[in-house]
Each structure stands twice: as C-alpha cells, then as structure tokens.
C-alpha cells in the first residue's frame, strides 16, 4: 500500500484492507485445518491443532472459516473495489482449495504453485490504493512468490520424516536432500536481483538499492551456510524471515523517509 501510494495510505483504507486480508487469510487457514485433519494427526508438531479442532467441532470451525472469508469478500466489494475482491477470492480459494486439496497432496512442487495465493496480499494492498496494478507492485509480488519456496523447503528439510509419515510429497521426501538444496539456493539466489529491479527501474532510490544488495548478499551467505554446510534448517528458515522483514523495512524507509 505504501508503494502504491508513495506514502502513508489513508487510515480508513488501511484498516479496511488489513481487516479484509486478515479475514480472508484467517478463514482460509481455518478451512485448511479442517481439510488437513487426518494428515495433521500423523504429524506430532501439528497434532495439537487436530485436538483443538475436534474439541471445537469440525462443522462449527468450518462454518466460521467460510463466514470469515465471505465477510472479507463482501466488505472488499462494497467498501474498497472489485479488483481487491477478486484478488481476495483468488487468494482464499487458491490456498484453501487448490493448494490444500490438490497441489500439496499430488505434487512435490505444490509449494511453488501455492506461493501465488500466498503472495497475493501484496497486490491486494496495492489494488486497495489504486485498481491499476503497477509494475512496481508486480515486482514485489514476484519477489514474494520466489521467497516462499526456499523458506518452506527449509522447514520441509527439518521435518521431512513427519511429512513422509503423513504421506505429503514435499520436495525432500520425493527427491531427497541434495536436489532440494540445489533448488533452495537457486530460488534464494534469484531474490536479490529481483529486489534490485525496484531501484534499477527507478521506483526506489539508491538507498534501497544498496540496502537490497547488502541484505541479499548476507542472506545468501547465511542460507548456504545453514542449509548446505551445516544442515541447520531451522536457522535457515528463521533467516529467510529476517531477510524478508529487512527488505520490507528498507522499502518503507526509502519511501517514508525520502
């Protein structure tokens, strides 16, 4: 939203957009929990989620998830604009239906496809400010699409035995650790150049360009060390979060402090 506005968006639009994103994302996550119940009960780190689901009642939980998504779509259509509504529907449906029921269960590359609905909040925020999606918004969207697979694959490497027991064909289970590490690094290596496009195409200043360059170099060094050299996948997972947050903070600082 800040990128689209080139400044702070008005409070009303900001609150409504965040409420719609939280409602749609939360509702989709709830539906994902219901649909993944049998899979999750075979994974120790997610078993408590199944216990809570059953104690609350599957029907009530599913109804709450559908209601949250429906409310988000209704508010976005009436108070924001139809582009936001369509993107919200694509994000919620893509995650709760396509990713949960199809991509994750059938393909080792489900994470790559699932990254699209996961990154749509970037375009949703942009469209809330202006329905005409700009190239800068598309670049940021693609950055989030490419960021998610290596982020998740680090987690999948750490918990690959749980995924194997649950029958989820994540990349390490389907193709092994060496292949997964190669893809992790290829995706990670694409992130710094993509972020630099925001400076190279004139959307942001040299401050962001230098920040993105330094952050990208540090991220790649840490990611290689933790995934390839030391096999500390939990740290690699955390490092990707820190990298994303720092890039977004650099973007905000570049615009708001200019």
What are these regions (language model features)?
Residues 2-18, 73-86, 122-144, 196-208, ...:
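Helix-coil boundary and interhelical linker segments in multi-pass alpha-helical membrane proteins
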Residues 3-37, 44-45, 86-97, 137-147:
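Membrane-embedded alpha-helical segments that form the functional core of polytopic membrane enzymes
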Residues 8-10, 115-161, 177-179, 183:
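Functional transmembrane core segments of multi-pass inner-membrane proteins
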Residues 37, 41-86, 176-199:
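Multi-pass membrane catalytic core of lipid/isoprenoid biosynthesis enzymes
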Residues 49-52, 70, 112-129, 178, ...:
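Small-residue-rich segments of transmembrane alpha-helices in multi-pass membrane proteins
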Residues 58-129:
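Intramembrane alpha-helical segments
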Residues 217-247:
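Interfacial loop-to-transmembrane junctions
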């Amino acid at each position: 939203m800040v990128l689209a506005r080139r400044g702070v968006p008005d409070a009303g639009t900001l609150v409504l957009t965040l409420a719609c994103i939280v409602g749609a994302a939360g509702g989709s996550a709830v539906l994902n929990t219901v649909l993944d119940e049998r899979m999750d009960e075979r994974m120790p780190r997610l078993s408590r989620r199944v216990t809570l689901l059953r104690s609350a009642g599957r029907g009530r939980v599913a109804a709450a998830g559908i209601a949250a998504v429906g409310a988000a779509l209704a508010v976005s259509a009436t108070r924001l604009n139809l582009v936001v509504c369509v993107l919200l529907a694509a994000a919620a449906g893509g995650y709760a239906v396509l990713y949960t029921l199809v991509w994750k269960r059938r393909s080792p590359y489900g994470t790559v496809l699932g990254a699209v609905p996961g990154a749509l909040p970037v375009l949703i925020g942009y469209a809330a400010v202006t329905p005409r999606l700009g190239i800068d918004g598309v670049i940021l969207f693609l950055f989030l699409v490419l960021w998610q697979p290596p982020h998740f694959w680090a987690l999948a490497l750490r918990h690959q035995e749980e995924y194997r027991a649950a029958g989820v064909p994540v990349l390490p289970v389907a193709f092994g650790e060496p292949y997964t590490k190669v893809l992790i690094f290829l995706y990670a290596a694409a992130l710094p150049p993509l972020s630099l496009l925001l400076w190279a195409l004139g959307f942001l200043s040299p401050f962001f360009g230098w920040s993105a360059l330094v952050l990208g170099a540090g991220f790649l060094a840490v990611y290689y060390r933790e995934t390839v050299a030391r096999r500390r996948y939990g740290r690699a997972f955390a490092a990707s979060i820190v990298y994303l947050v720092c890039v977004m903070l650099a973007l905000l600082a570049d615009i708001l402090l200019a």
